[in-house]
Amino acid sequence: MKKFLFKQKFCESLPKSFSKTLLALSLGLILLGVFIPFPKVPKHQSVPLALHFTEHYARFIPTILSVAIPLIQRDAVGLFQVANASIATTFLTHATKRALNHVTINDQRLGERPYGGNFNMPSGHSSMVGLAVAFLMRRYSVKKYLWLLPLIPLTMLARIYLDMHTIGAVLAGLGTGMLCVGLFTSPKNLN
């Protein structure tokens, strides 16, 4: 029986290279969300059933799979990578929310939620669903987990429809999750 060495597996989990495409796409989404003045979406009286279902149930599927798949495959390195990316995403999202709360760009306060609350930018829900889907696609297989891709825009639309975030905030949130995957995840060796 192999001895599990925590420090060794942690060091193995640190990526040797980065996906330049994923990093460029994520930084582009963050900059787009922060600097483009998207129009305010009018308040909705009702939320479509698909978005209600996504907000309360479906958005958890990628997050559960991002932990379950490494466990099922006994992929300790993948488990460390999803943990590192999740911790980094949570920290980066909440630090950015506080840093941008009182920043105004194009006569729009980035921290102002559509209903008047604070800590709008970036969306934590969008960052976590983006992280989970991007992790599964980068670590294991784009083709195998392509079916999860629609959950990203559905989660983003649900947050907008529920008047919880602006369009820019959900785009920046998606970029934040993808950025952390790009920095902390490498494809699994098929050997």
From Swiss-Prot:
Gene3D superfamilies: Phosphatidic acid phosphatase type 2/haloperoxidase (1.20.144.10). The keyword Heme does not apply. It is found in: Cell inner membrane. GO terms for cellular component: plasma membrane. Keywords: Antibiotic resistance, Cell inner membrane, Cell membrane, Hydrolase, Lipid A biosynthesis, Lipid biosynthesis, Lipid metabolism, Lipopolysaccharide biosynthesis, Membrane, Transmembrane, Transmembrane helix, Virulence. Pathway: Bacterial outer membrane biogenesis; LPS lipid A biosynthesis. It holds the Pfam family PAP2. Signal peptide: none annotated. The chain crosses the membrane at residues 22-42, 60-80, 117-137, 145-162, 164-184. Belongs to the lipid A LpxE 1-phosphatase family. Removes the 1-phosphate group from tetra- and probably hexaacylated lipid A species. Absence of the 1-phosphate group renders the bacteria partially resistant to host-derived cationic antimicrobial peptides (CAMP), allowing it to camouflage itself from the host innate immune response, and plays a role in the long-term colonization of the host's stomach. This is Lipid A 1-phosphatase. It comes from Helicobacter pylori (strain J99 / ATCC 700824) (Campylobacter pylori J99). The gene is lpxE.
